[in-house]
Amino acid sequence: MVRIIKWLIGLAVLSVAGALIAAAVIYFAIMPGLPDVTELKRVDWQMPLSVYSKDGKFIAEFGETRRSPVSIDDVPAQTKNAVIAVEDAHFYKHIGVDWRGIARAVWLTATTQDERVPGGSTITQQVARNFFLTNEYSYFRKFKEMLLALKMEKELSKDEILELYLNKIFFGNRSYGIVAAAEYYYGKKLEQLSLAETATLAGIPKFPSTGNPTSNPERSMIRRNYILQRMFEEGFIDREAMLSAQAEPNTAKRHEQQVQLHAPYLAEMVRIEMVRRYGERANTGGFKVITTVHSEDQLSAERAVRTGLMQYDMRHGW
């Protein structure tokens, strides 16, 4: 019996040693090829090309994404707390990887069917994945994600990492970043959002296309109420605030920027010239072009053309 126990102990020691050696080999094989995370200190955010008249009337927008980068200093505490409560409650305590969070996620996934279960990835890991990796799941990719997160925590402050997350993450409907999401779903600035609206936005990134408040209001409200509960559990809000916000209806709707001056040919001329000057960066560099065309002059010209064509038809017929 003693011999068997010794054999089992020896086997366990060998297994642990083998796992550590394998991890070390993988670590030293991967580390040299990891991206330089200091690049995240100078991110060139993709933003659309906007065209305006001389007097500031909106004419057109070109680009695949909506985004308005925001400094972490300008993000309300309520917004930060909602995101942290649902995505990474230990964000300001861990070193990039939250082992307790991973264990909790594995346990809840194995024992429940609740899709609201938080993932094991920290906010830092999500930033690493969104900037440097793909969403394809594999243990190798997950290991790289963890190593990148550890590197990021050494090079960047917690606030810098949270700022990257809030500006990078996808919120559905071409909206990237929390500011663009607030503008699209509520037509508001971050500081104007109610607690319920803030919690709704914080819940979108998990299901940005199928769970946002306009595509699936019911699913969105379930997740909103869960986030409000998490904010209460983490001490960010009191019970009264939680219950009050949970009772609010879904008020989200699409807020597209309305064209104030219809001049598609002018807009296309501007786009072509910008591409000639700046290449593809024209559609992603966040350029705001103020043309020399005044809206009243454009409208007067259109009226003159229409009047002239009508008079020509009246004189010459069809």
Language-model features, listed with the residues they occupy:
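N-terminal periplasmic "start-of-domain" segments of outer-membrane beta-barrel proteins
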Residues: 57-67, 102-109, 141
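N-terminal type II signal-anchor transmembrane helix
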Residues: 1-52, 90, 110, 264, ...
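Flexible, acidic/glycine-enriched loop-and-adjacent beta/alpha segments
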Residues: 71-123, 177-181, 186
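Terminal hydrophobic membrane-targeting helix
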Residues: 30-82
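Non-catalytic, structured segments within soluble enzyme domains
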Residues: 24, 115-318
